[in-house]
């Protein structure tokens, strides 16, 4: 590995794992893949300790950093969802000897990654094709990702700058589109009261859909995890297969609604750990039909690309993109 002259430490911090890499902001491909490392967060008392361990292991001293964290960033502080770490930007920067340290939400990083994605990093899910555009060309993108929950955001590109749009769109109320979905909503309403999109389109959402379909059929499926449903569907189980089909159709409807709400006419990127597991189903299900089925806007929606992100380190890529964009900021601009 040849370290860049001014390396930036980038990180993608979740509740279980911490991923680190170096970025070269002057390179055409800023994320240095051969520097990527992953550690269990339980092995360290703080993010600063984990970052210092990584830098010592790789033998490089960075002076700047961009850390994407799975939790809310509030000024100088970030809290990791499902982990007791409370991160202070200023204290962590001092501990590492950094002149600059940015803390960003992990889904903001997923959105920023769009600016560096290449055609080989995505798989088209029906509809129109997509090619990266020059950074100087205005673009509006949407990003949606089912995992433990449902992340929804966007990326606005203007005048060579990238602006991630952070939202809580996963908590928008679920709008059923068929009689079957109305019945599913009724069943889930008995359990949760208000039913958001996240109650269906995420890993636990697969279980919720399967449980509702089982109740409609008068069957008790017993305790299940998302991986059990995908495995049963792959083995040809009819109810599990219907669960996946319904998941994909609802996912498409919600992703299409996001385009209308955000004006994300240049494409929607599907991210998260669940997408690769159901990719084949997405491509051969009602995802795209429901994505496009938007009344008077159906013709326009047919021209909006929908793309599954397959890059193995999209969070790190997004942190690297943020570092690159920060260098484009004019003196006095906030980033």
From Swiss-Prot:
CDD domains named in the record: ASKHA_NBD_GLK
Primary enzyme class: transferase
Catalysed reaction, written as an equation: D-glucose + ATP = D-glucose 6-phosphate + ADP + H(+)
Assigned GO CC terms: cytosol
Gene Ontology MF terms: ATP binding; D-glucose binding; glucokinase activity
Subcellular location: Cytoplasm
TM helices/strands, residue ranges: none
E.C. number: 2.7.1.2
Binding site for ATP: 11-16
Keywords recorded for this protein, A-Z: ATP-binding, Cytoplasm, Glycolysis, Kinase, Nucleotide-binding, Transferase
InterPro entries hit by this protein: ATPase_NBD (IPR043129), Bacterial_glucokinase (IPR050201), Glucokinase (IPR003836)
Chief subcellular location: cytoplasm
One Pfam family, short name: Glucokinase
An annotated GO BP: glycolytic process
PANTHER family: GLUCOKINASE
Family assignment from sequence similarity: Belongs to the bacterial glucokinase family.
Stated name of the protein: Glucokinase
Native species: Xanthomonas campestris pv. campestris (strain B100)
